[in-house]
């Protein structure tokens, strides 16, 4: 039987969970694009307020956890495991990834203020430039991780390391593991 909804992978597949987060980020970025065309025509109507609320919720709650998953668990595990070409690539990519996380957080603070006003119905203004910059940063960042970091993790991390990564991600979200 097929389901009507996409289900998220379990924490026993931590790299798949991170990819699922990227897919959700892409959906939120698409919502921001839709808001850019919706607001000039309809203003901060109920649809716009709900869309702003959804984007706010994702980028203030889920996205920071995703960054912590990478910074506190995934990237350190890769650093301790990688050798030769993988170690050289990580040495090159890690500073860039960390810098991108900081830049995305800073750019988010600009958008967050605008989206809160839309959510409250007090403004229908959303900066196209801010949206484009934020989206471009995230899309580039996710491509980098999906092209280099995720395949490396799948290739070099042991089952035990994957299990620890998944358990840390689950705990970070306050999800109690199944007793089974």
Segments the model singles out, each with a brief description of its role:
Residues 1-180:
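Small-residue-biased structural context
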């Amino acid at each position: 039987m097929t389901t009507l909804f996409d289900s998220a992978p379990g924490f026993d597949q931590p790299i798949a969970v991170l990819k699922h987060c990227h897919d959700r980020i892409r959906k939120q970025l698409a919502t921001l694009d839709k808001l850019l065309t919706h607001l000039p025509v309809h203003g901060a109507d109920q649809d716009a307020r709900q869309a702003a609320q959804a984007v706010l919720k994702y980028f203030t709650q889920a996205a920071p956890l995703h960054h912590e998953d990478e910074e506190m668990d995934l990237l350190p595990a890769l650093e301790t495991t990688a050798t030769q070409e993988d170690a050289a690539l990580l040495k090159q990519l890690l500073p860039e990834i960390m810098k991108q996380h900081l830049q995305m957080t800073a750019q988010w603070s600009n958008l967050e203020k605008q989206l809160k006003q839309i959510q409250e119905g007090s403004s229908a203004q959303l900066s196209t430039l801010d949206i484009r910059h934020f989206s471009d940063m995230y899309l580039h960042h996710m491509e980098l991780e999906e092209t280099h970091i995720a395949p490396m993790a799948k290739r070099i991390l042991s089952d035990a390391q994957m299990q620890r990564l998944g358990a840390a991600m689950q705990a970070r979200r306050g999800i109690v593991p199944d007793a089974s």
